[in-house]
Amino acid sequence: MLFCLRSCHVSLEDKLQSEPSPELISSSISTPGRRAAIDRSTRETQVTLRLDLDGTGGADVRTGVGFFDHMLELVAAHGLFDLTVRAEGDLETGAHHTVEDVGICLGAALAQALGDKRGLIRYGSAVVPMDEALVLVALDLSGRPYFAYEGGPVGEAVAGFEASLVPEFFRALANNAKLTLHVRVLARGDFHHTVEAVFKGFARALRQAVSVDPRAYGVPSTKGVL
């Protein structure tokens, strides 16, 4: 993916009116502190995303996919991140492109906001119940992208959000954040409850991993780099 530096203060309308190129129209990153701003535009989607890892859990999300908006709001609330997302995609063909591209942007934002990862806890895990559903999430800010997903719903959907979109989102996020992510559904129940537990578990695990260890000053690896 080609990234170019430019001002983050570009409206989604301005991007939509720009002249398209064959694939990626534009993408830009700005990362003051533990914040990141991503603008990504293709023929299929236009995504603007702002992330503050040291936020208060505030979310302002509009992707055109209501259930997905709710899940991203849960990530912000349970991770204590501030998250703003604006996405416009080819929803007439389904939500796949929009969900995947938001995952790409959130992963890229995480990678940029974390910088060289000095002083971080690095690892995080959570076991989250949602009534009858139970989900385990474990992650490592390893610099090595890997995603594993076991036991999740298959062939179900709610409000146009299909079960297959859950792994698609997290795979895109893990690849672009360069993190190792394991999601295991230990007890599957109602589709909404199961997916909600997955997103909450991810948020809780990530909140732990990106926390700063006051006793650590270097990169949390004997290699000296992640």
Please give the residue ranges for each predicted region.
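Structural preference for solvent-exposed beta-strand-turn elements
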Residues: 12, 16-226
